[in-house]
């Protein structure tokens, strides 16, 4: 216990980061209980440790420092991933390698630590994919089921306001009309109640026999139900299908109306243009005869000579005049 505490105190005096100190403390032989407590949070590094043992076997590398450096690189990567929330694994790898460079001064131990960071990367990616697969995903039919539930709730709330009643109109002897209105009441006949009890007893007696057959029938149903499962699903969930069909039909009708208005040809009737020879064309159409030149009488009026008016008086400037 003294050696890890002394090494931890030395690293603290040297100013190493707290993240690295935590890794070195967990990697020690006396911190197995603490390491197991952090495994559930930081992730499993056993596969990375086995890869380090295969890379640095003790019969080939008699020194244990490189093996421990590789295993600490695995743990460093897990801690960096926990700090960064696993957003970018490439960035986590760079942070792990920089921590290895700060922790080890010898090149062999630095390389072993970097190798541990590299070995932990594929296992971290696999763990991230597994966590993403466990996250709940929204089904494609979830919006339709949501609309169906909303529609059913709205219909139930609307039916709660609807009340049924009986109304009777009677006419008295004096001619007055009397109206009786009351809510319907359900009355059970005694012989029907007795029949219902008999049916209940007979149904209970048949349940034991039907349960044995249902177990076998249910097994056969599961085998044969795969073929008609889609049709059965449609028959059971026809409400939201009808609602969806109605909504889509309304949307298609609106789209057709808008498209027709936008692409319709303008109904423009051009006005008839006036022609200079319109009178002549009219005469030709009506087959009218022209008047001869001798039948035309030219009346000339004698123009009267008018004397021209005299010149206008000269302009007088009122500002220079005295009144």
UniProtKB/Swiss-Prot annotation:
Chain location of the short sequence motif ATG16L1-binding motif per the record: 263-281
Chief location category: membrane
Biological process, per Gene Ontology: autophagy; positive regulation of autophagy
Alphabetical UniProt keywords: Autophagy, Cell membrane, Endosome, Glycoprotein, Golgi apparatus, Lysosome, Membrane, Phosphoprotein, Signal, Transmembrane, Transmembrane helix
Glycosylated residues, chain numbering: 90
Transmembrane segments: 239-259
InterPro entries on file: Uncharacterised_TMEM59
PTM info: N-glycosylated.
Extracellular side: 36-238
UniProt KW Protein biosynthesis keyword: no
An example Gene Ontology CC term for this record: lysosome
Signal peptide (residue range): 1-35
Cytoplasmic side stretches: 260-323
Compartments in which it is found: Late endosome membrane; Lysosome membrane; Cell membrane; Golgi apparatus membrane
UniProt-listed Pfam families: BSMAP (PF12280)
Modified sites of kind Phosphothreonine: 303
Topology in membrane: Single-pass type I membrane protein
PANTHER family per UniProt: TRANSMEMBRANE PROTEIN 59, TRANSMEMBRANE PROTEIN 59-LIKE PROTEIN
Oligomeric and partner information: Interacts with ATG16L1 (via WD repeats).
UniProt function note: Acts as a regulator of autophagy in response to S.aureus infection by promoting activation of LC3 (MAP1LC3A, MAP1LC3B or MAP1LC3C). Acts by interacting with ATG16L1, leading to promote a functional complex between LC3 and ATG16L1 and promoting LC3 lipidation and subsequent activation of autophagy. Modulates the O-glycosylation and complex N-glycosylation steps occurring during the Golgi maturation of several proteins such as APP, BACE1, SEAP or PRNP. Inhibits APP transport to the cell surface and further shedding.
Domain commentary: The ATG16L1-binding motif mediates interaction with ATG16L1 and promotes autophagy.
Record-stated family: Belongs to the TMEM59 family.
Name of the protein: Transmembrane protein 59
Organism: Macaca fascicularis
């Amino acid at each position: 216990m003294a050696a890890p505490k002394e090494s931890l105190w030395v690293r603290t005096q040297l100013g190493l980061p707290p993240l690295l100190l935590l890794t070195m403390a967990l990697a020690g032989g006396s911190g197995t209980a603490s390491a197991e407590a952090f495994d559930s949070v930081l992730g499993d590094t056993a596969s990375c440790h086995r890869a380090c043992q295969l890379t640095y076997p003790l019969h080939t590398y008699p020194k244990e420092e490189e093996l421990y450096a590789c295993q600490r690189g695995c743990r460093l990567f897990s801690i960096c991933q926990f700090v960064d929330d696993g957003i970018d694994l490439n960035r986590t790898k760079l942070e792990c390698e920089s921590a290895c460079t700060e922790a080890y001064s010898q090149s062999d131990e630095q390389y072993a630590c970097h190798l541990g960071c590299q070995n932990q990367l594929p296992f971290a990616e696999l763990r991230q994919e597994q966590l993403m697969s466990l996250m709940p995903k929204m089904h494609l039919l979830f919006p339709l089921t949501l609309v169906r539930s909303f529609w059913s709730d709205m219909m139930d709330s609307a039916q709660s306001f609807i009340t049924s009643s009986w109304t009777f109109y009677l006419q008295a002897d004096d001619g007055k009309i009397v109206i009786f209105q009351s809510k319907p009441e359900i009355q059970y006949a005694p012989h029907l109640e007795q029949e219902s009890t008999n049916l209940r007893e007979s149904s209970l007696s048949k349940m034991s026999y039907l349960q044995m057959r249902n177990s076998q029938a249910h097994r056969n149903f599961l085998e044969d139900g795969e073929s008609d499962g889609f049709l059965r699903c449609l028959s059971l969930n026809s409400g939201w299908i009808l609602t969806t069909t109605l909504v889509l039909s309304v949307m298609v009708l609106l789209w057709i109306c808008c498209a027709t208005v936008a692409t319709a040809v303008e109904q423009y009737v051009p006005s008839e243009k006036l022609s200079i020879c319109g009178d002549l064309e009219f005469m030709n159409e009506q087959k009218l005869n022209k008047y001869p030149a001798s039948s035309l009488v030219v009346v000339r009026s004698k123009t009267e000579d008018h004397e021209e008016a005299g010149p206008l008086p000269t302009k007088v400037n009122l500002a220079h005049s005295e009144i």
